[in-house]
């Protein structure tokens, strides 16, 4: 095979962290050392032999040692085309991804499945979820033109009978990869011949070793996910955790950096059956912090900042810290941040198995953005303690209708509103609300699905579209306060006392999403009367929601009256900005309050800021030339 060089670049490539993290290569350590020497002695060059550096994973070998891997890494980009209607979704020379996920498995097939489960695009893996393409022409077109979802389309093509030779002819993807897909398709077909009662242990184990999720197997067997979970537990088909050691167990690794897989049981000379689990659970008090998953619009690196500082605070409180995340771009997935790192999908099945293995005191969900919050309901239902604000309060704030009733009960101003679950209900509400109307679904990220409508035709079309995309959702319709000023406040609450850590005024008018708005800290144009209302409302809402930890509240101000837009009892994207502007470790304080270690009065809040701090978003519209660029 002939290889040709396309380009060569000095410096670190975008996938450098994936390579360094999983091979133990010390490029980052070398660069840090060079920079430190350069800064300290004002020199430009430091010559360092590679064998002078230690392998940071094994701690017992030098960096001058070729990595030996007994695991496979799969990286998949994360796109956000749904935010850009009309955008060109074909991939090409210009990068369009907004983030990425990484997965580790014993085989390519297992790692591929885990990576697709990490994407958070409402897929349970490759196939076996009823969401694949079935139209021949659509599939052929997506194979011809590199589509963002081609990793799924290849599987769909095999399922409808398109030959591997034809797929190779169109895509030029190596036949080895296509045969891996074909094997997965054959396993799905085989499992489909059985039901949950008669499927063999060997076939179920093989499916799990290939990375199929319990949900996918349930889809194949036409049963519940819980039945598959119960079946594999009865047959001792359990996850085991392996070290990412860079040396295939040739040397002892000291870094607690794990991935999951499934193994055949081993029987020793004494007849004892077991599986080799390299992650040994201790008797220490433990806390799990759920990460924020892949970067995308509405959920970026701000939440990773919160997760990292939360982990460090929990460690200061004497807990063994356990981080779960799948984003290779983050600091939280550095193998020396938490006491244990599980590089796993932030996906229910994986999370629950880790919790069953580690038996932590509880799980922190309010630092990982919407990704972690979406798991709160299942954690609560399965008896897992949520650290800080309870699931009941989290759900109350997320449910637009229930939250509006809470405001009404506490005499806090809010725009006229109504809750609709059908288009007919929405049209009836419109008669009493008056246009323009803001339509907002519950339980969404980054303003997804929110829209201002100005007539009944627009309202009906948008509600029908929303309920198709997000079935069984409660939609909040409220009268849009045209011309209002928008502001937001972040606060910490210990359940009895509230400390506001920052109030920001948006420069754009109300109606521009807070993540897209320029904002100033502190406000530059709000009078004392308005500021006092913001403080009073923040105190009332934080206490009414029984908040323990962080809370963010957004306001609309019109005619000197402060109305509530929404409240989120979790870390917001502005917390890192406020913490850095005021030079205060607010996430550290909030985490210690969540853990019950401290109260508000235990901390000295001394924000330090001369002048104003300005938050300004950065857009990438140049990547999407044909989309509407209006905010």
Predicted feature residues:
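Short alpha-helical "recognition helix" segments of helix-turn-helix
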Residues: 166-167, 216-218
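ATP-dependent carboxylate activation and anion-phosphoryl transfer catalytic cores
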Residues: 55-211, 234-239, 279-281, 285, ...
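ATP-binding N-terminal substructure of ATP-dependent carboxylate-amine bond-forming enzymes
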Residues: 230-233, 242-412, 421-428
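Acidic/histidine-enriched active-site and ligand-binding environments that engage anionic O-linkages
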Residues: 428-438
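Amphipathic alpha-helical
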Residues: 55, 219-255, 455, 462
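Conserved beta-strand termini and adjacent loop/short-helix elements that scaffold enzyme active sites
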Residues: 21, 48-50, 324, 389, ...
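ATP-dependent adenylation/nucleotidyltransferase module used to activate substrates
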Residues: 1-57
């Amino acid at each position: 095979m002939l290889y040709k060089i396309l380009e060569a670049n000095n410096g670190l490539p975008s996938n450098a962290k994936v390579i360094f993290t999983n091979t133990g290569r010390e490029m980052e350590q070398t660069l840090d050392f060079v920079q430190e020497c350069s800064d300290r002695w004002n020199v430009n060059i430091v010559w360092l032999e590679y064998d002078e550096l230690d392998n940071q994973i094994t701690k017992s070998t030098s960096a001058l040692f070729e990595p030996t891997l007994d695991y496979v890494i799969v990286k998949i980009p994360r796109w956000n085309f749904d935010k850009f209607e009309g955008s060109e979704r074909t991939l090409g020379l210009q990068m369009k991804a907004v983030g990425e996920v990484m997965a580790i498995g014993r085989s390519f097939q297992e790692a591929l499945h885990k990576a697709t489960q990490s994407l958070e695009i409402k897929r349970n893996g490759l196939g076996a979820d009823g969401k694949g393409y079935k139209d021949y022409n659509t599939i052929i077109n997506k194979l011809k033109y590199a589509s963002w979802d081609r990793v799924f389309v290849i599987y769909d093509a095999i399922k409808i009978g398109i030959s591997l030779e034809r797929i190779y002819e169109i895509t030029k993807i190596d036949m080895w990869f296509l045969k891996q897909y074909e094997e997965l398709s054959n396993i799905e077909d085989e499992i489909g011949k059985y039901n949950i009662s008669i499927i063999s242990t060997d076939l179920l184990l093989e499916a799990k070793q290939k990375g199929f999720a319990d949900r996918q197997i349930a889809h194949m067997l036409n049963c519940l996910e819980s039945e598959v979970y119960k079946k594999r537990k009865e047959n001792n088909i359990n996850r085991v955790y392996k070290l990412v050691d860079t040396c295939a167990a040739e040397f002892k690794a000291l870094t607690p950096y794990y991935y999951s897989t499934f193994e055949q049981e081993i029987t020793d000379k004494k007849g004892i059956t077991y599986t080799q689990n390299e992650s040994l659970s201790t008797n220490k008090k433990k806390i799990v912090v759920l990460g924020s998953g892949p970067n995308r619009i509405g959920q970026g690196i701000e939440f990773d900042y919160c997760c990292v500082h939360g982990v460090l605070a929990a460690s200061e409180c004497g807990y063994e810290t356990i981080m779960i995340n799948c984003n290779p771009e983050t600091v939280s997935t550095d193998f020396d941040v938490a006491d244990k790192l599980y590089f796993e999908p932030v996906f229910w099945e994986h999370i629950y198995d880790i919790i069953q293995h580690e038996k932590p005191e509880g799980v922190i969900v309010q630092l990982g953005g919407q990704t972690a919050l979406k798991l709160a309901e299942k954690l609560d239902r399965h008896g897992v303690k949520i650290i800080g604000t309870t699931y009941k309060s989290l759900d109350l704030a997320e449910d637009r209708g229930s939250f509006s009733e809470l405001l009404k009960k506490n005499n806090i101003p809010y725009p006229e509103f109504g809750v609709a679950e059908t288009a007919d209900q929405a049209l009836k509400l419109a008669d009493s609300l008056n246009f323009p109307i803001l339509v907002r679904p519950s339980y969404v990220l980054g303003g997804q699905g929110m829209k201002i409508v100005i007539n009944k035709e627009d309202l009906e079309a948008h509600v029908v579209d929303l309920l198709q995309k997000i079935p069984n959702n409660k939609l909040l319709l409220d009268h849009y306060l045209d011309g209002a000023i928008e502001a937001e406040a972040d606060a910490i609450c210990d359940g009895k006392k509230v400390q506001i850590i920052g109030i920001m005024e948006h420069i754009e008018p109300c109606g521009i999403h807070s993540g897209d708005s320029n904002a100033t800290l502190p406000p530059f144009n709000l009078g004392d009367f308005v500021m006092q209302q913001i403080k009073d409302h923040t105190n009332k809402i934080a206490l009414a929601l029984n908040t323990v930890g962080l809370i963010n509240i957004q306001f609309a101000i019109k005619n000197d009256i402060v109305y509530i837009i929404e409240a989120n009892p979790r870390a917001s994207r502005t917390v890192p900005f406020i913490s850095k502007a005021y030079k205060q470790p607010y996430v550290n304080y909030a985490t210690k309050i969540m853990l019950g270690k401290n109260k508000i009065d235990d901390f000295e809040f001394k924000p330090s800021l001369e002048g104003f701090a300005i938050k300004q978003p950065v857009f990438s519209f140049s990547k999407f030339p044909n989309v509407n660029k209006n905010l």
